Curated annotation (Swiss-Prot):
InterPro entries: HAD-like_hydrolase_sf, HAD-like_sf, HAD-SF_hydro_IA, HAD_sf, PGP-like_dom2, Phosphonoacetald_hydro. Its cofactor is Mg(2+). It catalyses: phosphonoacetaldehyde + H2O = acetaldehyde + phosphate + H(+). GO terms for molecular function: magnesium ion binding; phosphoglycolate phosphatase activity; phosphonoacetaldehyde hydrolase activity. Coiled coil: none annotated. Belongs to the HAD-like hydrolase superfamily. PhnX family. Involved in phosphonate degradation. This is Phosphonoacetaldehyde hydrolase. SUPFAM superfamilies: HAD-like. Homodimer.
Amino acid sequence: MKIEAVIFDWAGTTVDYGCFAPLEVFMEIFYKRGVGITAEEARKPMGLLKIDHVRALTEMPRIANEWNRIFGQLPTETDIQEMYEEFEEILFAILPRYASPIHGVKEVIASLRERGIKIGSTTGYTREMMDIVAKEAALQGYKPDFLVTPDDVPAGRPYPWMCYKNAMELGVYPMNHMIKIGDTVSDMKEGRNAGMWTVGVILGSSELGLSEEEVENMDSAELREKIEVVRNRFVENGAHFTIETMQELESVMERIEKQELIIS
């Protein structure tokens, strides 16, 4: 078994440590309507197409009940569309500030390319959003061989279509010769649904939800407890492997190739 390509997520995996760009915006669009949502709630659907993320938030029982208490009805599709339009407007303005490659990513990508590994990517951002992020990331030294957004396929995560399109464009098959790596539950489901080796990265992830400063300053026992919670969540949602940092990816690849493991 030889791994021929790795498909990376973007925010929380290769750029934007902690996946903070969309978080505050999701909270803001609800707050403006008198409905407070927590950071934990805002993060839960992370990785989905962003309008689906807004919709998922409105369907959470506590948020739906609070909305109903204030407005006398549940959120409508018009409400969702209006909030999404506001989300886009605010996010576009701040995205360039959240496109810096996470520490160590560029070095890992360079090492993979030296081994002849192709680099693909998928995202929950729209094509218009990624035009901003990808351009800024490229200026800072990170540019995958191919990028697929939910706009390019019939549906985003957890459907496997973005991974399939990467495979076609990169010319790699079968799918178990590829690794999908991401930082959310929806990434794990996307990879498994595509029949790929699926890896969850923990530090810098949306699931962990901590900044670099918070990680550095946190009590080691508390940090370890949080890491294990995320690790278990990834495994429960289909991850074949979990890594704490991107630097561990190549050792995972070697395990797959040397031990002839079988996807289950």
